[in-house]
Protein backbone atom coordinates (compact mmCIF):
# COMPACT_ATOMS: atom_id res chain seq x y z
CA UNK A 1 0.00 0.00 0.00
CA UNK A 2 1.17 3.52 -0.72
CA UNK A 3 2.59 5.70 2.02
CA UNK A 4 0.20 8.52 2.93
CA UNK A 5 2.06 11.83 2.90
CA UNK A 6 0.71 14.72 4.96
CA UNK A 7 2.26 18.15 4.41
CA UNK A 8 2.55 20.80 7.14
CA UNK A 9 3.82 24.36 7.19
CA UNK A 10 5.65 23.93 10.50
CA UNK A 11 7.03 21.18 12.71
CA UNK A 12 4.69 22.28 15.50
CA UNK A 13 1.65 21.78 13.25
CA UNK A 14 2.98 18.35 12.30
CA UNK A 15 3.52 17.45 15.96
CA UNK A 16 -0.05 18.40 16.85
CA UNK A 17 -1.49 16.46 13.92
CA UNK A 18 0.58 13.42 14.87
CA UNK A 19 -0.56 13.68 18.49
CA UNK A 20 -4.18 13.94 17.37
CA UNK A 21 -3.81 10.85 15.17
CA UNK A 22 -2.18 8.83 17.95
CA UNK A 23 -4.78 9.92 20.51
CA UNK A 24 -7.52 8.87 18.09
CA UNK A 25 -5.89 5.47 17.55
CA UNK A 26 -5.47 4.88 21.29
CA UNK A 27 -9.05 5.94 21.99
CA UNK A 28 -10.34 3.54 19.33
CA UNK A 29 -8.26 0.74 20.84
CA UNK A 30 -9.54 1.44 24.34
CA UNK A 31 -13.13 1.46 23.10
CA UNK A 32 -12.70 -1.76 21.11
CA UNK A 33 -10.35 -3.82 23.27
CA UNK A 34 -10.05 -2.14 26.67
CA UNK A 35 -6.27 -1.65 26.39
CA UNK A 36 -3.99 0.23 24.01
CA UNK A 37 -0.32 0.07 23.10
CA UNK A 38 2.04 2.65 21.65
CA UNK A 39 5.66 2.47 20.46
CA UNK A 40 7.57 5.75 20.41
CA UNK A 41 11.06 6.83 19.40
CA UNK A 42 13.68 8.93 21.14
CA UNK A 43 16.03 11.67 20.04
CA UNK A 44 15.20 15.36 20.08
CA UNK A 45 12.65 15.34 17.24
CA UNK A 46 9.63 13.91 19.12
CA UNK A 47 9.66 16.33 22.07
CA UNK A 48 6.99 18.62 20.61
CA UNK A 49 4.83 15.61 19.78
CA UNK A 50 5.24 14.28 23.33
CA UNK A 51 4.12 17.60 24.78
CA UNK A 52 0.99 17.56 22.60
CA UNK A 53 0.15 13.91 23.26
CA UNK A 54 0.51 14.05 27.05
CA UNK A 55 -2.38 16.52 27.17
CA UNK A 56 -4.75 14.17 25.33
CA UNK A 57 -7.93 13.21 27.18
CA UNK A 58 -7.24 9.49 27.48
CA UNK A 59 -7.60 6.87 30.17
CA UNK A 60 -3.84 6.60 30.39
CA UNK A 61 -4.08 3.85 33.01
CA UNK A 62 -5.06 1.47 30.20
CA UNK A 63 -2.27 2.53 27.82
CA UNK A 64 1.05 0.66 27.49
CA UNK A 65 4.04 2.50 26.02
CA UNK A 66 7.41 1.19 24.93
CA UNK A 67 10.32 2.30 22.75
CA UNK A 68 11.36 1.47 19.21
CA UNK A 69 14.97 1.43 20.36
CA UNK A 70 17.28 2.38 23.20
CA UNK A 71 20.85 3.47 23.63
CA UNK A 72 22.47 1.17 26.19
CA UNK A 73 22.66 3.70 29.01
CA UNK A 74 20.60 4.10 32.22
CA UNK A 75 17.62 6.42 32.13
CA UNK A 76 19.55 9.00 34.13
CA UNK A 77 21.92 9.48 31.19
CA UNK A 78 21.13 12.44 28.89
CA UNK A 79 21.29 10.09 25.89
CA UNK A 80 18.61 7.74 27.26
CA UNK A 81 15.41 7.48 25.24
CA UNK A 82 13.58 6.23 28.33
CA UNK A 83 14.72 9.31 30.22
CA UNK A 84 13.41 11.50 27.39
CA UNK A 85 10.01 9.78 27.47
CA UNK A 86 9.77 10.14 31.23
CA UNK A 87 10.71 13.81 31.09
CA UNK A 88 8.54 14.88 28.16
CA UNK A 89 5.67 12.38 27.72
CA UNK A 90 4.97 10.72 31.06
CA UNK A 91 3.86 13.90 32.77
CA UNK A 92 0.53 15.01 34.20
CA UNK A 93 -2.28 12.57 33.51
CA UNK A 94 0.03 10.54 31.26
CA UNK A 95 2.04 9.40 34.30
CA UNK A 96 -0.68 6.77 34.71
CA UNK A 97 0.45 4.99 31.54
CA UNK A 98 2.36 1.72 31.83
CA UNK A 99 5.88 2.27 30.49
CA UNK A 100 8.11 -0.62 29.43
CA UNK A 101 11.73 0.50 28.93
CA UNK A 102 14.15 -1.54 26.85
CA UNK A 103 17.21 -0.89 29.03
CA UNK A 104 17.11 -3.30 31.97
CA UNK A 105 20.56 -2.91 33.47
CA UNK A 106 22.08 -5.89 31.67
CA UNK A 107 25.73 -5.57 30.76
CA UNK A 108 25.03 -5.48 27.02
CA UNK A 109 22.00 -5.19 24.73
CA UNK A 110 22.47 -8.82 23.66
CA UNK A 111 22.29 -9.94 27.28
CA UNK A 112 18.91 -8.23 27.65
CA UNK A 113 17.18 -9.71 24.62
CA UNK A 114 15.58 -12.77 26.23
CA UNK A 115 14.14 -10.95 29.25
CA UNK A 116 13.00 -7.86 27.33
CA UNK A 117 11.46 -9.98 24.58
CA UNK A 118 9.29 -11.74 27.14
CA UNK A 119 8.25 -8.38 28.57
CA UNK A 120 7.42 -7.02 25.11
CA UNK A 121 5.39 -10.10 24.25
CA UNK A 122 3.10 -9.34 27.19
CA UNK A 123 2.07 -5.94 25.79
CA UNK A 124 -1.20 -5.54 23.86
CA UNK A 125 -0.33 -6.57 20.31
CA UNK A 126 -0.52 -5.79 17.49
CA UNK A 127 0.70 -2.39 18.67
CA UNK A 128 -2.05 0.16 18.09
CA UNK A 129 0.43 2.75 16.84
CA UNK A 130 4.16 2.93 16.17
CA UNK A 131 5.88 6.30 15.88
CA UNK A 132 9.28 6.09 14.22
CA UNK A 133 11.97 8.59 13.41
CA UNK A 134 14.55 8.61 10.66
CA UNK A 135 18.14 9.80 10.49
CA UNK A 136 19.77 11.42 7.49
CA UNK A 137 21.61 8.12 6.94
CA UNK A 138 18.24 6.40 6.47
CA UNK A 139 18.22 4.54 9.79
CA UNK A 140 15.00 4.05 11.68
CA UNK A 141 14.68 2.73 15.23
CA UNK A 142 18.32 1.60 15.66
CA UNK A 143 18.44 -0.24 12.36
CA UNK A 144 21.54 1.42 10.92
CA UNK A 145 23.01 0.93 7.45
CA UNK A 146 26.19 -1.08 7.65
CA UNK A 147 25.46 -2.54 11.09
CA UNK A 148 26.31 -6.19 11.66
CA UNK A 149 23.21 -8.36 11.56
CA UNK A 150 21.14 -5.76 9.71
CA UNK A 151 19.74 -8.22 7.17
CA UNK A 152 18.43 -10.48 9.93
CA UNK A 153 16.92 -7.54 11.83
CA UNK A 154 15.18 -6.42 8.61
CA UNK A 155 13.62 -9.83 7.92
CA UNK A 156 9.88 -9.10 7.97
CA UNK A 157 9.15 -12.73 8.85
CA UNK A 158 11.93 -13.12 11.41
CA UNK A 159 11.06 -14.60 14.80
CA UNK A 160 12.99 -12.08 16.92
CA UNK A 161 11.36 -9.01 18.45
CA UNK A 162 14.67 -7.39 19.39
CA UNK A 163 18.14 -7.01 17.92
CA UNK A 164 21.38 -5.86 19.52
CA UNK A 165 23.00 -3.23 17.32
CA UNK A 166 26.44 -1.61 17.30
CA UNK A 167 25.98 1.42 15.03
CA UNK A 168 28.95 1.97 12.70
CA UNK A 169 29.04 5.73 13.37
CA UNK A 170 26.57 6.65 16.13
CA UNK A 171 27.44 6.48 19.85
CA UNK A 172 26.41 3.70 22.26
CA UNK A 173 25.42 0.09 21.62
CA UNK A 174 21.67 -0.19 21.06
CA UNK A 175 18.72 -2.48 21.54
CA UNK A 176 16.19 -2.13 18.73
CA UNK A 177 12.86 -3.56 17.78
CA UNK A 178 13.27 -5.61 14.62
CA UNK A 179 11.35 -4.92 11.44
CA UNK A 180 9.11 -7.90 12.23
CA UNK A 181 8.25 -6.38 15.61
CA UNK A 182 7.58 -2.94 14.10
CA UNK A 183 5.30 -4.48 11.48
CA UNK A 184 3.31 -6.15 14.25
CA UNK A 185 1.27 -2.97 14.44
CA UNK A 186 -1.94 -1.46 13.15
CA UNK A 187 -0.37 1.75 11.82
CA UNK A 188 3.13 3.24 11.53
CA UNK A 189 3.64 7.00 11.75
CA UNK A 190 6.80 8.74 10.54
CA UNK A 191 7.33 12.46 11.25
CA UNK A 192 10.08 14.06 9.14
CA UNK A 193 11.27 17.66 9.40
CA UNK A 194 13.69 19.43 7.09
CA UNK A 195 14.77 19.25 3.47
CA UNK A 196 17.58 16.76 4.10
CA UNK A 197 15.29 14.16 5.65
CA UNK A 198 12.65 14.71 2.99
CA UNK A 199 15.29 13.96 0.35
CA UNK A 200 16.30 10.73 2.10
CA UNK A 201 12.62 9.80 2.42
CA UNK A 202 12.13 10.32 -1.34
CA UNK A 203 15.21 8.22 -2.16
CA UNK A 204 14.09 5.42 0.13
CA UNK A 205 10.67 5.32 -1.53
CA UNK A 206 12.16 5.42 -5.01
CA UNK A 207 14.86 2.77 -4.55
CA UNK A 208 13.40 0.45 -1.88
CA UNK A 209 16.86 -0.77 -0.84
CA UNK A 210 16.67 -1.35 2.94
CA UNK A 211 20.28 -2.42 3.33
CA UNK A 212 21.35 1.04 2.11
CA UNK A 213 18.45 2.99 3.67
CA UNK A 214 16.81 0.79 6.32
CA UNK A 215 13.73 3.03 6.54
CA UNK A 216 12.85 1.67 3.08
CA UNK A 217 11.92 -1.61 4.76
CA UNK A 218 9.08 0.25 6.47
CA UNK A 219 8.11 2.44 3.53
CA UNK A 220 8.12 -0.24 0.82
CA UNK A 221 6.12 -2.95 2.59
CA UNK A 222 2.40 -3.55 2.08
CA UNK A 223 1.34 -5.20 5.34
CA UNK A 224 0.91 -2.12 7.55
CA UNK A 225 -0.30 1.38 6.61
CA UNK A 226 2.30 4.15 6.96
CA UNK A 227 1.65 7.87 7.30
CA UNK A 228 4.49 10.38 6.88
CA UNK A 229 4.19 13.84 8.45
CA UNK A 230 6.37 16.19 6.38
CA UNK A 231 7.35 19.67 7.56
CA UNK A 232 10.10 22.24 6.87
List each language-model region with its residue ranges:
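Short glycine-rich phosphate-binding loop at a beta-alpha junction
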Residues: 34-41, 128-130
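Class I SAM-dependent methyltransferase SAM-binding "motif I" and its flanking Rossmann-like core
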Residues: 136-180
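ATP/nucleoside-binding phosphotransfer catalytic cores, i.e., glycine-rich phosphate-binding loops
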Residues: 2, 180, 186-232
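Ligand-binding beta-strand-loop-alpha-helix segment within the catalytic cores
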Residues: 2, 61-131
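N-terminal glycine-/serine-/threonine-rich phosphate-binding loop
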Residues: 1-38
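Short, conserved loop/helix-junction motifs that constitute active-site signature segments
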Residues: 56-64, 93, 153-155, 180-185, ...
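Glycine-rich beta-strand-to-loop/alpha-helix junction loops that act as flexible
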Residues: 40-45, 132-136, 193
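A glycine- and small-aliphatic-rich helix-loop capping segment at beta-alpha/alpha-beta transitions
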Residues: 52-60, 83-86, 145-154, 206
Amino acid sequence: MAVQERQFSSSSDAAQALADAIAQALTAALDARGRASLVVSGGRSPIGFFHCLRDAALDWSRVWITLADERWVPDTDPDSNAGLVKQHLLQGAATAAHFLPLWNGAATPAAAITERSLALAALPRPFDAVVLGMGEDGHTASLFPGAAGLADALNPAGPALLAAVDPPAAPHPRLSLTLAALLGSRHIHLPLAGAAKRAVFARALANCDPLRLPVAAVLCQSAVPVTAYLSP
